[in-house]
UniProtKB/Swiss-Prot annotation:
This is D-aminopeptidase. The active site is at residues 62, 65. Belongs to the peptidase S12 family. Inhibited by beta-lactam compounds such as 6-aminopenicillic acid, 7-aminocephalosporanic acid, benzylpenicillin and ampicillin. Inhibited by p-chloromercuribenzoate. Residues 477-487 are annotated as: Important for specificity. Keywords: Aminopeptidase, Hydrolase, Protease. Pfam families: Beta-lactamase, DAP_B. The keyword Magnesium does not apply. Its EC number is 3.4.11.19. The keyword Hydrolase applies. It catalyses: Release of an N-terminal D-amino acid from a peptide, Xaa-|-Yaa-, in which Xaa is preferably D-Ala, D-Ser or D-Thr. D-amino acid amides and methyl esters also are hydrolyzed, as is glycine amide.
């Protein structure tokens, strides 16, 4: 490729504080192992007036997952080495237990444990300890799809990996990371700090320019799925290590970033803690990270030996910034989608009865729709009267049915339009035997509210909103991890006499949790 258009790239970077508003951040571009751009702005702590620098450490959150998998490959070998240990760990399973490779590739079908903490009554700013993580993970008996058939993001996969690695080696993950990864990569200040409450070198902020920025409170203990704190310079060193070892057939990053498939042979979007993407015909590998008050993203294009890194101490869209930086470095112009006028027949709520997942669509203007299906809303371009797509999802409408496809997830669902009014007779207490947790629904002044209760406590009351007959939505916008699970979908079941017998509770991260009415 031709040389990077440095003025264009610099112009984008210097506009980041205006386009991604928040207290501070740090970004870098690396090509051929050399630093093209290294920039920090704003403040690491607004109250202390402590400036952000390339040496400022921040939590890299889920970017840690690739490093957990790197330790696995470097210290133990192929994932199959730990399959028997995983069978002992998930000893409550009757059948359909995932393999360790499924964990590495987010194909396990296990429900995300941070999402399940909500159902177990956790407070967003509560304390979450290692024994509580194992308590939750080791009680699991089912998956929400057959392992190896689909992709679903699951932090618990990597928490379990960390436990298995420590058990197998007899050493802490912190020591293994320091010795086998950080030292060879010259990541001089990178460190595993599992307890988020202990990190105080930089402050992460909730909020925005409308509500203001407030210091985020985090008191969770995580391991394997996240927990590494690193500076921009540490992350630059990682990219340089990747470039130095690119010709090594057994190089760590080459092994981490190798293509993966589903059980049916279809290409998978994820492997060994890395997300696979494409831009302008170029393959990218990388990962994002999030915790309340923090966002980060790294991308690497092996074909052109280019990497981009974005780290924010606020909840800005680091993934968007990192991809746009990559496109600028690659000389890829912004896409100009052709949009059609929205047909009102799109708008409303649509249910897939098999998974209990609900798709909600509303007009966003300018030939776009706002869709709610996964962890957060996504904007969809309407490309024809009955077709719409985003970077993740394709929709094809046929009357009162929408065919939803998420190719990367190997997921194809028939979504049926919800018509009619919801009955109000859902109040009561419901029990999940697998989670040993309750859902309490009450009616106050004609409005329905719900709360979760379990071994982690009793949650606040959340309002429910009707989506259609016997289908309700319960939004949860703050949880222990970030982003939050979003809308929980509640699909109620009735007997032949019309009495409520139970409810299926789920979201994209944790589908199909069955509750019976008490």
């Amino acid at each position: 490729m031709p040389n990077i258009d440095l003025p264009t790239l610099e112009a984008f970077v210097h506009a980041i504080p205006q386009n991604y508003k928040g207290p501070g951040g740090a970004v870098a571009v690396v090509r051929n192992g050399e630093i093209v751009l290294r920039h920090a702005w704003g403040f690491a702590d607004l109250a202390a007036r402590k400036a952000m620098t390339p040496e400022t450490r921040m939590p890299i959150c889920s970017v840690s997952k690739q490093f957990t998998c790197a330790v696995l490959l470097d210290c133990i070998g192929e994932p199959e080495m730990l399959d028997s240990a995983l069978a002992a760990y998930l000893d409550q399973f009757e059948d359909g237990r995932p393999a360790v490779r499924d964990l590495c590739n987010n194909q396990s079908g296990l429900r995300d444990y941070w999402a399940l903490t909500v159902l177990c009554g956790a407070a967003p700013e509560g304390i979450f300890l290692p024994d509580q993580a194992q308590n939750l993970l080791r009680r699991l008996k089912t998956t929400h799809f057959a392992p190896g058939t689909h992709y679903s993001y699951c932090n618990g996969n990597f928490r379990i990996l960390a436990d298995l690695i420590e058990q197998h080696t007899g050493r802490s993950l912190a020591d293994l990371l320091a010795e086998r990864i950080f030292a060879p990569a010259a990541m001089k200040t990178a460190e595993l700090i599992p307890d988020t409450a202990l990190f105080n070198e930089c402050t992460g902020y909730e909020g925005d320019t409308v509500r203001g920025f407030l210091p985020a409170i985090n008191r969770i203990h995580w391991l394997g799925d996240a927990g590494i704190c690193a500076s921009l310079d540490d992350m630059i060193a990682w990219e340089q290590f990747i470039d130095r070892t690119r010709h090594d057939e057994n190089g760590l990053y080459r092994r981490l970033s190798s293509p993966q498939t589903f059980a049916d042979g279809a290409p998978a979007p994820y492997g060994f803690g890395l997300k696979f993407e494409e831009t302008g015909g170029k393959r990218l590998t990388g990962h994002g990270g999030a915790l309340r008050g923090w966002r980060c993203q790294r991308w690497h294009c092996a074909d052109e030996r280019i990497s981009t890194i974005v780290m924010f101490n606020f909840e800005g869209n680091a993934s968007d910034a990192a991809l746009k930086m990559m496109n600028a470095a690659l000389g890829i112009p912004p896409a100009k989608p052709v949009r059609a006028q929205a047909n009102p027949g799109w708008f409303g709520s649509w249910l897939n009865p098999e998974t209990g997942l609900v798709l909600s669509l509303e007009d966003a203007g300018g030939g776009r729709m706002k869709a709610r299906f996964g962890t957060g809303p996504e904007k969809m371009d309407i490309s024809g009267e009955n077709e719409a797509q985003s970077s993740m999802t394709t929709l094809r409408r046929d009357g009162d049915m929408i065919h939803l496809a998420r190719k990367d997830e190997n997921l194809h669902l028939a979504m049926h339009r919800l018509k009619g009014e919801a009955r109000q007779d859902i109040a009561g207490r419901y029990r999940s035997d697998e989670l040993e947790a309750d859902l309490l629904l009450v009616s106050e002044g004609g409005a329905i509210y719900g709360a979760f209760e379990g071994f982690l406590g009793k949650s606040d009351m959340y309002p429910l909103y009707a989506a259609g007959p016997d289908v309700w939505l319960l939004p949860v916008q703050r949880s222990m991890d970030a982003p939050s699970p979003g809308e929980w979908k509640l699909v109620f079941h009735r007997d032949a006499a019309g009495r409520i017998t139970g409810v299926t509770v789920g979201c994209w991260l944790a589908r199909g949790v069955e509750y019976k009415r008490l």
